[in-house]
Amino acid sequence: VTTVKASALFFTKPLTITGGGTLNAKSEDFCAIYAWGTDLTIDDCTVNASSAGYGINGDSGESEKLTIRNADVTAEGGQEGAICNFYSLTLEGCTITQPAGAAFDATLNGVALNGELVKSGLTIAKGTSGILQPTISTTAPKGIYTLNGQKLRGTLRDQAKGLYIVSGKK
């Protein structure tokens, strides 16, 4: 969707953009996506929002909530901001990957870096929570343990009669 002198997508009631496809929203000079006093959810799809003015924009930043869930989003807002004028931004199953270090700033009501709203090159990618998969050692550490998992000192002969785990075996 491409427009001149208007928002590519303008709405006044809560909206969810969803589906397996891609939405390309471009406005030559206003907002690519404009959530006027309401909430926006982007769920399990790809959204590319680009404008010389605002990329993805709320109205006042007093109550509008933006939720991005398992989605890929790029946003450009050349003069004002890529994602701005929202009260909150919730990311579920995705994270801001570009520019590095960018995050939602509640004072500026948008995605910012170094105290300024990000205006171009904003990328949010799904499947990157920022937490890596843990690496689990499959070998039990050598030693003598109680059934509660407490490590004991000394040898097995030094312990009182009972059940113990020795080198990972009862």
Segments the model singles out, each with a brief description of its role:
Residues 1-127:
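A composition-driven surface/loop motif
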Residues 128-170:
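C-terminal outer-membrane/trafficking sorting elements
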